[in-house]
Every structure is written in structure tokens, then in C-alpha cells.
């Protein structure tokens, strides 16, 4: 039997949205379809894969719907950690279905499963004292200050656009469902995991996990996963064709390998 090759593939949340005119669920599904075609190519070449993905734009949409529903119909708002879980399920569904379809048409006997994944962060991570990650929509100053007083939000002003909530971006310490992911991989099942960097949780004094309002960098979480499963390859999929130096400047230059 040939030696197994392990790969962790991190898909950018923005790579599921081609441009501002292609943001619908169907648009994202079609982008996922294209991505899964390439992943299936790797699997056909003998790779066992775990797939991580970003969720920034998708969580932004979920939060916006929540804010509108709250203002218009008085619906309860959705906490950030639950938004992350929602997006893991939705994006995982799109990837899972497209991979299953690829396997069927290629006659590959393979299964794929999405794992709703929690990632432990340190409640004393310095980023909690200096949150910088903007989330949600813009607010006027009165609304922003009300949120600060009543809900303990951190907010910043964006000149000319209003106020916006900011949250911490702590480093990932431990993947709670790692054993589940490892079991899937050991049995030849593709695992979709650490979506959006994982749902950030902290541990209380009694050893219980609690969701927290934060955003974990999906590349850090996927890198941690690659280390833990001793992957042979860590691959990051983005919306651009290659790595650039001086990105988005007149001096931008692609790096070829």
C-alpha cells in the first residue's frame, strides 16, 4: 500500500465571492463548485484532505440580516459565535455537496463530512484588551454608545461612515473536535473543519467551554490543524492568482515558484 499523503486546504471566505455582483447563495455555491473540482483533482492524485475555510463575508451577511430583523420586526439578535456556527453549516453544506457530486461523477469511493468546530482561545489573550476586528453594520453615535453601555461592546468611529463594533482576534490554542477530525481522516473521509477559524470558545473555572465574541484568523487555525495532524502540505486558496509583494500598490509584483 502506498504511503498516505495528508493535506490541509484553507479556502478564503472571499474566494467564495468572486465580486460584489456575485454574492448570493447561488453565486457562492457555484464558486464552491469550482473550488471542489480542484480539490477532487488532488484527491484523485492520492491526497487525503482536511478543508478549512474563511467566513468573513458570510458572517457579515448573517449579522446584517439579524440587525435588520431586530430593527424591523423586533426579532432577537444572533450572537457572533452562533453566526460562526451558522456559517460553518452553510459553507460546509455547499462544499460537502459539491465534493459528493465530484466523487460520484469521477467514480471515487469517498465520503465527506462537515464538523462544527470549536477552537479554544486564551481568555487572557492581549487582543481582548485591544479589539480591532470590525464586524457588523455601521451605527450612528447614539446607537454605538447605547451598545457600549448596555452590552459592553467595543466600538470605533469610521470617519464619514459612522460607528462600528470591533472584537478581538485571539490566537487559536486548541481544536476541541481534533479527535473527531483525526478519526474521519484516518478512515479516509474528507473533513471540512475549523470554518472561519473555528467558533472561538474560552474555558471557565469549572472546565466548561463558553462561546465568546471574537474572530480567529482562519489561516492560523488551519495551520494549527496542519501541525496537529502532521500534514505533508498546507495550501491556502485565495481570490487572487498568486502571492504578491506590495499588494494593491503600483509596485505590486507576483512571486512565481
Go through each PLM region and give its residues.
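Short, well-ordered amphipathic alpha-helical segments that serve as non-catalytic structural scaffolds
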Residues: 32-42, 95-98, 219-230
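General beta-strand structural signal in soluble alpha/beta enzymes
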Residues: 9, 51-53, 108-116, 191-195, ...
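Active-site phosphate/oxyanion-binding loops
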Residues: 17-18, 60-81, 129-190, 194-257
Amino acid at each position: 500500500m502506498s504511503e498516505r499523503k495528508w493535506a490541509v486546504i484553507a479556502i478564503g471566505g472571499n474566494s467564495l465571492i468572486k465580486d460584489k455582483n456575485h454574492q448570493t447563495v447561488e453565486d457562492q455555491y457555484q464558486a464552491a463548485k469550482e473550488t471542489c473540482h480542484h480539490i477532487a483533482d488532488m484527491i484523485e492524485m492520492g491526497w487525503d484532505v482536511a478543508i478549512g475555510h474563511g467566513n468573513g463575508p458570510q458572517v457579515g451577511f448573517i449579522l446584517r440580516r439579524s440587525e435588520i430583523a431586530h430593527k424591523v420586526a423586533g426579532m432577537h439578535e444572533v450572537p457572533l459565535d452562533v453566526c460562526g456556527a451558522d456559517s460553518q453549516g452553510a459553507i460546509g453544506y455547499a462544499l460537502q455537496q459539491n465534493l459528493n457530486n465530484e466523487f460520484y461523477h469521477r467514480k471515487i469511493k469517498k465520503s465527506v463530512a462537515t464538523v462544527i468546530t470549536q477552537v479554544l482561545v486564551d481568555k487572557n489573550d492581549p487582543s481582548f484588551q485591544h479589539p480591532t476586528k470590525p464586524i457588523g453594520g455601521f451605527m450612528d453615535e447614539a446607537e454605538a454608545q447605547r451598545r457600549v453601555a448596555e452590552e459592553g461592546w467595543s466600538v470605533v468611529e469610521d470617519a464619514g461612515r459612522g460607528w462600528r463594533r470591533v472584537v478581538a482576534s485571539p490566537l487559536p490554542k486548541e481544536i476541541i473536535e481534533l479527535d473527531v477530525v483525526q478519526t474521519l481522516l484516518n478512515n479516509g473521509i474528507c473533513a471540512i473543519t475549523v470554518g472561519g477559524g473555528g467558533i472561538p470558545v474560552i474555558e471557565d473555572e469549572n472546565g466548561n467551554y463558553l462561546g465568546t465574541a471574537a474572530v480567529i484568523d482562519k489561516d492560523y487555525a488551519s495551520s494549527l490543524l496542519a501541525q496537529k495532524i502532521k500534514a505533508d502540505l498546507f495550501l491556502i486558496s485565495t481570490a487572487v492568482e498568486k502571492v504578491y509583494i506590495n499588494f494593491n500598490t503600483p509596485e505590486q509584483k507576483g512571486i512565481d515558484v
